[in-house]
Amino acid sequence: MSQVADFGKPAPIFIITGGDPFERADIYELVRRGKELGLPMAVSPSGTPKLSRESLTKLKDAGASAISLSLDGASAEVHDGFRRVPGTFDRTITGWREARELGLRVQINSTVTKSTVHELPDLLRLVIELGAMTWSAFLLVPTGRGTELDALTPRETEDVLNFLYDAGTFAPVKTTEGHHFRRVVMEREVLADLGVDHVEALGLGSLYQDLAARLAEIGPVDRKRRPPLHVNAGNGFVFVSHVGTVHPSGFMPIAAGDVREQTLTDIYRESPLFLGLRDTSRLEGRCGKCEFAGICGGSRSRAYAVSGDPYGEEPLCPYEPGSFPYQHELALALPNMGNAR
């Protein structure tokens, strides 16, 4: 933890994940130590009986500022079926409410698959009703249990990312391993400025139209969209395993070093793997030719999982470089990407 603090200011967000962090008897001591070091502390608990008001109160008292909870369906039937554990939906909803009451910020993480994609509008309703600092849609990386799940096609993913852009006027929205969301945001901003219909211009399909129609039922909201952060594996993000090995992300099993042998700052700043992942000239395939490479870069974790090459093209992106029809307007807008409406 002291090595993370050595990154300096602004202090990195320190997230304790698992498994279930509440399985550690010293979880509160770890949070307290991180807080003493000046780190913003967050915890990602599982929807188990250990997710109680007592444990959340202890987290808050120890210095945690936020938690993240997984919610993949808007009903017990869907969520518990997806997680294969009865009772997780009710425990998660209760924990969400209690965390908010205690003053903890809550991020909701939703895995998007063929079996859960139609839950997205109803999940958004829950996010609006119960309140969350962020709703994060996770696009599958085929590792671990992710290899057993039905991932969306690239065109379906495009429909979902455009729905999430629309949802951004209702709640703070981000993606996990969906880096081409930044491309979609830029495309939509340019089209909106030109008054061009995005459905036709982007060739969006029936999945988008179904999700958008259900979104319209929620009612008009006009909040400022949260600009998507440019964070990717090894670029603004680092994962340290429970045994000390250092990885660009939790979904990329390549180790760049070990905190028991080198400092975390040295590994992040100097290892060939991390340096390579921050160099867009190393990107291959369509990603290497894409005009959006500087703001997107594709999921390096998914590229590695599918091809064995961390610099390979993004498998879930259907975009052909140079195909956006308003390239001049796009070139003018790209420098202002951080100011998305």
Language model feature labels by segment:
Residues 1-18, 23-155:
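Radical SAM/AdoMet-radical enzyme domain recognition
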Residues 1-18, 278-279, 313-341:
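Short Fe-S-cluster ligation motifs
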Residues 19, 72, 140, 178, ...:
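Flexible loop residues that form catalytic
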Residues 155-224, 245-297:
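C-terminal accessory region of radical SAM enzymes
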Residues 231-235:
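Short, small/polar residue-rich loop motifs at catalytic or cofactor-binding pockets
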Residues 283-327:
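Cysteine-cluster motifs in flexible loop/terminal segments that predominantly coordinate metals
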